[in-house]
């Protein structure tokens, strides 16, 4: 039977426990953020909860272990600590797949939040990242169109049957693209990778819903707040020195 523990994974850590498989959807937003965790295993100091959860998973995942993390868009493009954590992830792990989730995935709780699933295996550095776009020009998830398995049938075919897919077993398609590590490095390790043109932007009748616009604004504000928190932490450390 599974065990459920109520606590603070970032503050408490896992001691010596290590895991073969980790599936996690860390809490989004900046609520509860502000303090930089005092953990020796975190090589990058940040108050961003999502970035710290990535570092936490890197610690507790066994070498050869597999993980899938649901993370908001800003984790893919945030600068400073965000860039450093993404670099660490791709150095320590084979980040082989990113799934861009449909708009409205978290309906009715946080309809405007845009998110992704990052799939990786610990032990080998990233050579290439395959991205599946299940968002652009895809029916938005809402009460009339709830999220179900049909949204991901094509992704599952593209992903393949292996736990850790091999590039030679995959083929690019309209929604599935490969990006080399060098291409990503040239983007300053920005993983916000997309190539399809959003047809809704050409149609005045298909403008984003208010909750989507609010979600976009919240994401940008969270990025700005994270940057300010990092600056405040740096200034605080400077005073102590």
Annotate each predicted stretch with a short phrase:
Residues 1:
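Short, conserved SAM-binding/catalytic segment
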Residues 6, 11-241:
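A conserved structural/catalytic subdomain of Rossmann-like adenosyl-cofactor enzymes
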């Amino acid at each position: 039977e599974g065990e459920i523990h109520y606590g603070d994974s970032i503050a408490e850590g896992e001691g010596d426990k290590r895991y073969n498989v980790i599936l996690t959807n860390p809490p989004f937003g900046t609520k509860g953020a502000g303090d930089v965790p005092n953990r020796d295993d975190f090589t990058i100091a940040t108050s961003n909860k999502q970035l710290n959860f990535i570092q936490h998973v890197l610690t507790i995942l066994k070498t050869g272990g597999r993980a899938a993390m649901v993370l908001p868009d800003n984790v893919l493009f945030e600068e400073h600590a965000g860039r450093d954590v993404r670099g660490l992830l791709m150095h320590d792990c084979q980040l082989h797949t990113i799934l861009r989730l449909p708009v409205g995935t978290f309906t009715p709780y946080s309809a405007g939040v845009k998110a992704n699933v990052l799939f990786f295996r610990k032990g080998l550095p990233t050579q290439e990242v395959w991205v599946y776009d299940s968002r652009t020009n895809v029916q938005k998830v809402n009460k009339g169109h709830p999220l179900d398995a049909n949204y991901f049938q094509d992704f599952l075919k593209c992903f393949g049957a292996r736990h850790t897919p091999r590039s030679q077993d995959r083929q690019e398609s309209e929604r599935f693209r490969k990006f080399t590590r060098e291409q990503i490095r040239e983007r300053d390790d920005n993983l916000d990778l997309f190539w399809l043109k959003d047809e809704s932007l050409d149609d005045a009748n298909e403008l984003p819903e208010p909750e989507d616009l609010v979600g976009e604004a919240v994401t940008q504000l969270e990025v700005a707040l994270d940057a300010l928190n990092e600056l405040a932490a740096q200034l605080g450390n400077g005073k102590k020195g």
